[in-house]
Amino acid sequence: MLHVSQLFFVPLCPKVSNYMNQKLSHIDFDQAGADVFCFDNGTQVREYHAIIRVQQACLPFAQQVEAVLNAYNSLLAQLPGAQAVFKRYFLSDAANQADAIVVNDVTDCAKSIIQQAPLDGTKVALWVWLMTDVQTSMTQSELYEVSHGQFRHLFNASAHNLAANSEYQMRLLFNEYIMQLAQERCTLADNCIRTWLFVNDIDLNYGGVVRARNQVFFTQGLTVNTHFIASTGIGGRQQDPNVLAQMDNYAIAGVRPEQVHYLYAPTHLNRTSDYGVSFERGTMVSYADRRHVFISGTASINNKGEVMYPNDIVKQTQRMWENVEALLVEADCNFDDVAHMIVYLRDVADYQLVRSLYAERFPGKPCVIVHAPVCRPGWLIEMECMAVKAVCLPNMPQF
């Protein structure tokens, strides 16, 4: 039996259609709960983002996994026609837990499994992105394909290898991904929209990841004079301690150049290339009926590339929100359009305070706070998010 304890309707764009809306809901299941964002603009494809969390932290891991999977299946039953297109499991101890996820979750979609402990004291949490009226399959390139209309959305998750160090591992990951994209008649520069790079012991191994990405991007025509790719580079551990870098990614086959725009917010942030790294602050992809906005991992930084408010978690959180909001505004969005948030904390002792700040500002928003050191030690907190907004752009292709 499920109980919906909160339900909010937020009009998106009444000038476009009265049917276009977003909906937030909290659903309590047996031993787990879900915060759900629904985007339904009256066209064929509805989208859902959900964060599912265990409600009893004292349960053994096996029961926590069961609670999350049961909640997911119950949620799916309430969303006619919806299919998962991407999942991410946040684990407290990947070495002992990852295999259980692989065995018990047989969903036919890309599944990211990473050790980034949920900071509410539980052992597992799940973010899932769902869509209706799409066809899903595994391609010969081993990317997961989600098809609707003229687009094929290509997802990959938990890619890793055992090369000698983080630089070699990252270079091999990108080279393999470039070959996978080529099999789909795509390129890294033209089709890849978003990457996630998880770095084991990020304080030690991030430099190698950065060097590899810079080198690969240069060979692919991704430079400060063209564009980079929205990304999160964050601490995260795979079940094998010899894996120093793990990658998830998302590309769109068939996307047109005029659909993709990059976000800069120069009043608040500088170009990442100014301090030697290669990613975009955010990317928006526009369709005839909706806009997707992918905000990269964002911290308390200014437009000179400096850490703002060292050792002050409250002010860093507020500056981070300000930076994210500036990027969203550039895409003609705001926090109401955000479908989910992932928050990364370096110090577990900051959790209760950060949780209270988020609960006050973003009540009911799908959000998970996890333990994951940020790429620069001075940053105590980082967040990423995705926004979905209804638009009316008849010159763009339909989603």
Language model region names:
Residues 8, 15-339, 345-399:
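N-terminal presequence-like segments and the immediate start of the first folded domain
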